[in-house]
Amino acid sequence: MKKIFQYIILAVVTIVMASCTSDIEETTATTGKSNVQLVVGEFPAFGDSQTRAIGTLDEGKTSWTEGDELLLEMTSKTLGTKYAAFKYNGSSWELASGELSYKEDEVPTFPHVYYAPNYKWDAGNLVLKEGKVAGTDEYIEGTAQITPNGEAITVKFSGATRNYSRLRIATMPNKPITVDTEYFTPAGSSDMEQKGNYTLTSDEKGNACLYGTFENNSEVTVKYRGATLKTYKFSKETENAKSYALDATVISAKSAEEIKSAIKQEVANSKTAIILNLASDAGDNEFKTIREAFKNVQDATIDLTLIGCKEIPADGLKELNALKSIFLPDVTKIGMNALSRCVYLEEICAPNVSTIDERAFAGFIMLEKVTLGELTDVRGEANSGGGIFDDDNWTPYIDLYLPKNQEVMKGEFDENSNQYIWKPTGEKYFATPDYDNGIFLGYQFNSVKSWE
């Protein structure tokens, strides 16, 4: 006769956390004793140190929740090795797939039991689930054994050792971020990546996590829609079972007064790379405050990133001599004269902009690089004094970057608006002679390239 298991009794020992010593280190995990057999026991949490109050403290997952899975491997003399996944339904563990069976007069063993949300069994091997990426969740191995009466399996994580660390990235709540890594070994993998790229979404507290090992001199760069929020280089290899916190938070400044205060503080702290999270509907009053706040700042010193706002209104950042570069990851519309006569500006990056009004980028003498989104509405005729750039005096020195799906733009005068308007034709721009010759919107550029 053979036994088939449909449930698991869980006995879990909480992993106790200690404080940290490294510059961004948060916690140290060691094992303790608190053994109680329960249908659901405590999850072996990382914890979060009170000594590193970066962002909103987050100890991570602390208990089993509905939908959690455990992956078990069982071996018996007669029936061999079996594999199964058990899923937690909120009150008990149920067999989700596979089978665990053995002859009643034998005592099976359990070579492996995993909590690894990104993985599943496939022909006896752990493989990534579709759409999952190693390093974006836990990979914990516990132990399991048959109970003396043969009625259940007891799974323990009391001796579980994480052979990886956690990097908690504190940033804006509920936002997609990308994380570029160097010399990183994801949890569950033995292959170190010289260069990696991860797409994460922060939770409502603004936290997103990577699980794995960073080598000495490993570098991490956190970006939001291409805008760099934080770059950090590790001064030593991360330690197993420790949690680290990386501060990629952004100053939230919704009102004019908050904007004024934030810029004043950043300038007082000698910051030159300034990132502000504005309201999506930030308008004339907020941008007037930005101009005034930078009025007495040294020319050509500020790399400004404005997150959240959807539009730069007419004259919004006009004649802002402090600007050296500007990044506008969420902006879809740039108004008339919005950035005109920012004479020391060297780079403009607006990868989601689709609408640009007359003379938005006029009056530049230092501009070298412009990155734009897929344009659908551009106002102003080139070389007429009313185009988005100055006449051909300066555009031949500019490298223009467009998305690969950009269409050819055709311009004509519109009597209703009394403006010259460029609209897409349906023809792919990067398959035309104008692309080869560096011509776009009637302007001659140093080069035109795809940024995708």
Predicted feature residues:
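Extracellular/surface-exposed low-complexity segments
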Residues: 246-251, 397-452
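Structural signature of tandem-repeat unit edges
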Residues: 275-280, 299-311, 321-333, 343-355, ...
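Assembly/interface hotspot detector across virion components, adhesins/toxins, and nucleic-acid enzymes
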Residues: 86-88, 119, 144-146, 198-202, ...
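Core hydrophobic positions of leucine-rich repeats
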Residues: 290-294, 312-323, 334-344, 356-367, ...
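N-terminal segments that cap or nucleate solenoid repeat domains
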Residues: 251-294, 451
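Sec-type signal peptide cleavage vicinity
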Residues: 2-10, 17-265, 365, 452
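Surface-exposed substrate-engagement region within the catalytic domains
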Residues: 207-211, 219-226, 373, 390-407, ...
